[in-house]
């Protein structure tokens, strides 16, 4: 039996054990993982350095290297996320609803673990910690399959997690890493219906599209983040500047950074040139339509492809519109249903934007950078879903549960 099948079979066995573990036991395991990550920070960073050096040798972009890179602060941030997770209510065993039928049957809708979660992801080794801990909290076994670019980091983190779990009542194999990073291992994971209950892809558009297209296992789709901010005619200048600069430049390589600004022409007439200048001073390359070029000749003419691109870098598309309806049409045409924002003092337009724009998270007068499990108060997230079935938006603890119905009677038979 090869690695993928062997780990799938083991995960199925472990899932039956995990469903019996108490919240206290699961939290003890999470606490042990947080402590072990701090204890072995030097080891993790040493292994991460190998990935960074190999990435540089292969010519990885700065944005990809940033997603790949770990440092002491990022490891501390991981452990803080775990501590938040410990404090969160365990949804497993919760009674979602309960009712009694006229025949005396008592019916309860209960939350239960999904079972075995498969996670396939690119570059970011912090996902290894997020996925492992949120799955453990919800009583799920997890099979991790990262990319070759982060293999040293992922192997180190999982080894640390195993050493932590060895000190607890949870089996070490609750968290397993597929070390084979070839396409064959990924394709096998896609079709492992006998062992996987759900597969979650987390990465770029190409990875996600491949998983959605080829997997026979149920998929929780975490979409790419082609996010927009629409600056309405009534938008406050300073607020607009602050939000745009934050949403684009704070960390351009993440999925909740913006890729296009949509400007109302009347607002742009007053403040557009100054906004463009402010962005360029921060190293942002602007790609705009003809109206934007007429305001600033240094802007590169945007191609049709640019409007639908998740740049994940300091590149920003600029679209000028004459109405909110035109803005909404552009966003719904090119957006990825992730996070979209409007900056406006016109409540009617805000309401229209909220009703008409199709996305997991909609913002009024705030940065899209808040679409995140930590910022929503969920603790560590396993991804941001852009699909509509099962769950949408940042996927916290309830997203990794299903339901079962528990029916109690006193001898009823159906007539």
Swiss-Prot record:
Keywords: Amino-acid biosynthesis, Cytoplasm, NADP, Oxidoreductase, Proline biosynthesis. GO terms for cellular component: cytoplasm. SUPFAM superfamilies: ALDH-like. GO terms for biological process: L-proline biosynthetic process. Its EC number is 1.2.1.41. It is an enzyme of class 1 (oxidoreductase). Pfam families: Aldedh. GO terms for molecular function: glutamate-5-semialdehyde dehydrogenase activity; NADP binding. NCBIfam families: PRK00197.1, proA. This is Gamma-glutamyl phosphate reductase.
């Amino acid at each position: 039996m090869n690695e993928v099948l062997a780990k799938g079979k083991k995960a199925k066995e472990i899932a039956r054990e995990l469903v019996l573990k108490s919240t206290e036991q699961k939290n003890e395991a999470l606490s042990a993982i947080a402590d072990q990550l701090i204890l072995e920070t030097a080891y993790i960073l040493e292994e991460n350095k190998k990935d960074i050096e190999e990435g540089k040798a292969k010519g990885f972009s700065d944005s990809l290297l940033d997603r790949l890179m770990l440092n002491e602060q990022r490891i501390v941030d991981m452990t803080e996320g775990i501590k938040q997770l410990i404090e969160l209510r365990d949804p497993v065993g919760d009674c979602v609803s309960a009712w009694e039928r006229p025949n005396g049957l008592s019916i309860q809708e209960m939350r239960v673990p999904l079972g075995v979660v498969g996670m396939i992801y690119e570059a970011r080794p912090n996902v290894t910690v997020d996925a492992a801990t949120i799955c453990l909290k919800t009583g799920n076994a997890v099979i991790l399959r990262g990319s070759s670019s982060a293999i040293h980091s992922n192997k180190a983190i999982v080894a640390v997690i195993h050493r932590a779990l060895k000190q607890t009542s949870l089996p070490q194999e609750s968290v397993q890493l597929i070390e084979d990073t070839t396409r064959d291992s990924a394709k096998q994971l896609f079709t492992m219906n006998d062992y996987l209950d759900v597969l979650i892809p987390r990465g770029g558009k190409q990875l996600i599209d491949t998983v959605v297209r080829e997997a026979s296992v149920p998929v929780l789709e975490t979409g790419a983040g082609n996010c927009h901010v629409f600056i309405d005619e009534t938008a406050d200048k300073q607020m607009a500047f602050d939000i745009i600069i934050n949403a684009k430049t704070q960390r351009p390589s993440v999925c909740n950074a913006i890729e296009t600004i949509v400007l109302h022409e009347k607002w742009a007439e007053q403040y557009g040139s100054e906004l463009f200048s402010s962005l360029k001073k921060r190293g942002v390359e602007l790609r705009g339509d003809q109206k934007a070029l007429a305001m600033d000749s240094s802007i590169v003419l945007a191609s049709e492809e640019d409007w639908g691109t998740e740049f994940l870098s300091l590149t920003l598309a600029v679209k000028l519109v004459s109405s909110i309806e035109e803005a909404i049409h552009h966003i719904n045409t090119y957006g990825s249903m992730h996070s979209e924002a409007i900056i406006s003092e016109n409540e009617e337009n805000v309401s229209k934007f909220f009703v008409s724009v199709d996305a997991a998270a909609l913002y009024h007068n705030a940065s899209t950078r808040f679409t995140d499990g930590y910022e929503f108060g969920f603790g560590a997230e396993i991804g941001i879903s852009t699909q509509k079935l099962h769950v949408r938006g940042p996927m916290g603890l309830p997203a990794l549960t299903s339901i079962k119905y528990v029916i109690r009677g006193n001898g009823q038979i159906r007539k």
